[in-house]
Amino acid sequence: MKRNSYIFISLLLSVVLFTSCITEDEYDNSPEGNFEALWQTIDRQYCFLDYKKQEYGLDWNEIYSQYKQRISKGMNNEQLFEVLADMLNELRDGHVNLSSKLEYSQYREWFDSYPANFSDSIQRVYLGKDYAQSSGMKYQIFEDNIAYIYCGSFQSGIGEGNLDEVLNKLAICDGLIIDVRNNSGGNLTTAEKLAARFTNEKVLVGYMSHKTGPGHNDFSTPKAVWLEPSLDRVRWQKQAVVLTNRRSF
């Protein structure tokens, strides 16, 4: 079985398809082959194995021995899916999922074990029925002259003109609430475009590196990530707060 160019790990029938930019390996289309393929993919390409070993003692080699015992030639697709999903959940990573035509596995402990800190019904009350919407953002002005913008996803792009329009409409307000709780994630550039409206100077926001080989420590040299202000666009100059929770991807 070949590794294919997908970000997520997908189980289709008994064939596991997964990402690769390092090598092209062949695995038997069998429970054993699929198990080996998935374990090797994580071992070579997952970024946080050493970090998670330090944080809570994750030993990926021990995980191999533990879950290898649960693999048998006669198991069906549902049984195989369950074992592979359980193995991935050992990573405790809400971004690592396993999917098939009939099932979808996700590490839900990441958010289910903590307060939701978000209520759709309450949000509908303070958004009301007359809220405005632009580029996927819902926005409203509260009675105390505080503006509110909800961004439920960064999957679709946010137009620069749309941001100008929204911020111009809200310019009369004394403050702004940016709500990204339960944001399903999406494009980093979309989030950066929004954040650029809240700074007047270049800001260092972090560092980024990527995997360069199969070793757990094979990473490129960290590269600084800078947030550039949108100097030729409308920028927010008053107080602002951000609401987030553990379901903000």
Which residue ranges define each predicted feature?
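Bacterial Sec-dependent N-terminal signal peptides
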Residues: M1-D28
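Alpha-helix termination/capping residues and helix-transition junctions
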Residues: V15, L170-I172, V234
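Flexible, low-complexity junctional segments that flank or bridge functional domains
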Residues: S20-A224, Q239
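Active-site microenvironments of hydrolase-like enzyme catalytic domains
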Residues: G185, E228-W236
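Short, intrinsically disordered, charge-balanced linker/junction segments flanking boundaries
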Residues: R246-F249
